[in-house]
Amino acid sequence: MYAVVKTGGKQYRVAVGEKLKVEQIPADIDSQIVLEEVLMVAGGDEVKVGTPLVAGATVKATVVSHGRGEKVRIFKMRRRKHYQKHQGHRQNYTEIRIDEISL
């Protein structure tokens, strides 16, 4: 059984037991969270697609860790004008483990 959930403005295909890095969620490590924005649930031959959400469907997950992603380097330059600008960015993330998918 798998589901498509929306969190942090992005959509993820999840199954029970998977670990997944999502946008930062303000929750403590080893705490349970409930993802209620479930867009689709499928198991075997049965597929339920929401309009836009599947009514009553939830995904329960456990927060494993918090961290920061790889550095993205930004470099701007104007040719012949001796203008150069460097910038870097590291996005915060939360790693979660999917425990249960329920309808």
Swiss-Prot record:
User: InterPro entries from the entry?
Assistant: bL21-like (IPR028909), bL21-like_sf (IPR036164), Ribosomal_bL21 (IPR001787), Ribosomal_bL21_CS (IPR018258)
Q: Does the keyword Nucleus apply?
A: no
Top-rank lineage group of the source organism:
Bacteria
What biological process terms from GO does the record include? translation
What would you give as a GO molecular function for this chain, any one? structural constituent of ribosome
Q: What does this protein do?
A: This protein binds to 23S rRNA in the presence of protein L20.
Q: What family is reported?
A: Belongs to the bacterial ribosomal protein bL21 family.
What is the name of the protein in this document? Large ribosomal subunit protein bL21
Q: Give the organism's phylogenetic lineage.
A: Bacteria, Pseudomonadati, Pseudomonadota, Betaproteobacteria, Neisseriales
State which gene encodes it: rplU
